Structure formats: C-alpha cells, structure tokens
Amino acid sequence: RDFHADNIMVKNKTLGIIDSQDAIKGNLLYDVASLVDDVRIKTNNNFKTSLLKYYLTKTKKIKEKEYVMAKQDLSILSIQRNLKILGIFVRLYKRDGKINYLKFLPHTWKLIELRMNNEIFNNLKKLLDYAVPKKNRNKMNFNAN
C-alpha cells in the first residue's frame, strides 16, 4: 500500500525498502502501479511502459504475452489507488491543515485521466466528469463540507 519511490533506498549498490510495515499481499501489479504512477514524481509514458515490460520479463507470475491484460490491470489499480490518494490528500488538508499535499492534486488527476483511456472506464469517466468537472480539477477550493 505504501510502495513508492520515496521508500526505495540504495545502499552499497543494493536496493532496500523502508516503511514496509503496511505491506500486504495483493495484486502483483499494485506495486508497479504505485511506482509508475506515483503522484509525487512525474514520469513519461515510455518510462511507464518500459517499467511494466521489465517487470513482466523478470517475474514468473505474469507472462509477457499477457501484456494487454496486465496493462489493463495496471490501469484499474492505478485509478483505484489515485482516487484513494485524492481523498486522503483532501482529508489531510481539511482535517489536519496540511496544505502541502494539495500541490499534488492536479498531477493525480492527470494520472487518473491517463489511465482511463480504455472503454471499460466509460461509466467511471462520466461519473467523475459529473462529480468533479475537468475545469474544477485544478482548483483548490475545498470549503464545502
């Protein structure tokens, strides 16, 4: 749940992970989604695709020939994760006064929109466009309760 670039450290040319107390078993692509669509780090689409393909060639759990399905799973997980992050960041602002998380909201919306390029998300797109119109997604007005 908390796997992202800030929790990966390099020591003596070896990768290590910190802050792993919330680790749980789940979909194999959840951590990949967390890395390629990290709301705090902007990466280009080539990097995202390369990382997914690299992961698929290194793991024995998912075959590279299942790339299309893996890419769809990655989109589902990324959208779910980033919608949750939107809620968490707004809650941290409203409840705790932590304004610094608000700067990540526009990029989080961009990541969600990027991943909704599959027809399976058509209804979700309509719902989000109704609930939070695109013109309002970069505004920082959270005064309504």
What is each residue range found by the language model?
Residues 5, 10, 25-26, 49-53, ...:
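Glycan-recognition and catalytic cores of secretory/periplasmic carbohydrate-active enzymes
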Residues 28-63, 76-96, 108-116:
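Active-site activation/catalytic loop segments of kinase-like enzymes and analogous catalytic loops
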Residues 87-145:
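ATP/Mg2+ or Mg2+-diphosphate-binding catalytic cores
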